[in-house]
Amino acid sequence: MSKGLSLFERRRRRVRTALRARGGLRPRLSVHRSGRHIYAQVIDDEAGRTVASASTLDKDMKGKTGATADAAASVGKAVAERAKAAGVTQVVFDRGGFLFHGRVKALADAAREGGLEF
């Protein structure tokens, strides 16, 4: 068993450190993906609450599978609409340890098109 950190853990720590340095007072758009679904939340860390969220498990997204870039794009568009309705337009993108590629990139692009700035 390896004593070192996995590549995923290393990326996660590096991203979180950069978020703390650059994030300032803006909420963060946190993304989590699994093999079947993708989840996005806009989190206000100062208040300790979730401002807006969307995932492929939502009732309005039930017809779409979460394992595609199209489904991730619809989640990005939905979370952007909900965040704008809550009064949030500027966020910091928190990809966690996930590579900015594929479904994560599709979600980010759709959130930008939906009006979120990051």
From Swiss-Prot:
GO terms for molecular function: 5S rRNA binding; structural constituent of ribosome. This is Large ribosomal subunit protein uL18. It comes from Rhizorhabdus wittichii (strain DSM 6014 / CCUG 31198 / JCM 15750 / NBRC 105917 / EY 4224 / RW1) (Sphingomonas wittichii). Signal peptide: none annotated. Belongs to the universal ribosomal protein uL18 family. SUPFAM superfamilies: Translational machinery components (SSF53137). Part of the 50S ribosomal subunit; part of the 5S rRNA/L5/L18/L25 subcomplex. Contacts the 5S and 23S rRNAs. Keywords: Ribonucleoprotein, Ribosomal protein, RNA-binding, rRNA-binding. GO terms for cellular component: cytosolic large ribosomal subunit. This is one of the proteins that bind and probably mediate the attachment of the 5S RNA into the large ribosomal subunit, where it forms part of the central protuberance. The keyword Cytoplasm does not apply. GO terms for biological process: translation.
